[in-house]
């Protein structure tokens, strides 16, 4: 059921580069942390592969802005910019999607089948990445609380995820949450991708 994002697209576009730089900085700080504080891919080992996952896509548009823009388009715009910046800095990346489509397999016909297949394929992409780290991009929606804003990071149950989420959150608080800092939180088991990814995962929304 569609819900609405009470944020203007012009604001999102202005913030996009800042968010990308925040994520980029957090990933590199996390990777270069001292060995005794890093639990995944410590300095000197094979570099990680960042799997950039723009949430939703295709028929699954996610939430909808007050101007009629679907969440899937916003996620994709941010995901492409994050991917470009990471690659520009020499970071190996993989994207789960690079255009506004579902990545379900052939044979999925109903909306439910397509959604289930799409999620399974995203999990497969993450789990196939060498030394993978998942960064899933979403937009939260709280139409009953229009004063609520900002970005928050959530981690999955894999080793290293909490440290990365906290690094991302600290950078987000400095960049865009200065008035109302947020805390990174553990993601519950209800999010299929985060639950089944066999790599440290951070969902930002």
Regions found by a protein language model. Give the residues of each.
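Catalytic-site microenvironment of enzymes
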Residues: 1-205
